[in-house]
From Swiss-Prot:
Top-rank lineage group of the source organism: Bacteria
Described function: Located on the platform of the 30S subunit, it bridges several disparate RNA helices of the 16S rRNA. Forms part of the Shine-Dalgarno cleft in the 70S ribosome.
Pfam families noted in UniProt: Ribosomal_S11 (PF00411)
Record protein name field: Small ribosomal subunit protein uS11
Keywords: Ribonucleoprotein, Ribosomal protein, RNA-binding, rRNA-binding
Gene: rpsK
Annotated GO biological process: translation
Amino acid sequence: MAKRKIVKKKVVKKNIAKGIVYISATFNNTMVTVTDEMGNAIAWSSAGGLGFKGSKKSTPYAAQQAVEDALNKAKEHGIKEVGIKVQGPGSGRETAVKSVGAMEGIKVTFLKDITPLAHNGCRPPKRRRV
């Protein structure tokens, strides 16, 4: 029987200069997505996807690594300018924003907080007792 060839899917390099970095910082994880101005995803990364497990996913260091990974992937597509949209109350929030600003070759144009706030909607979960 003939062996089947495994064909790898080629990554198409897009030439995009401006983009938006969405940072979703929850209490358990930090997700980073880099999109173009229309909202089409170019690159993404998360603390859990980088090998951080359990409570280590929610650390600021894990958030920094996730941002650096996503932006390095996005740089291959020609990203030079980004805006930042931050969502959530997680501990990796501030570190993630700082590490975007510290990335070499990437200029930050704006910073916006898009955390959803309830106007007396659903009842929140009860307080934890430890």
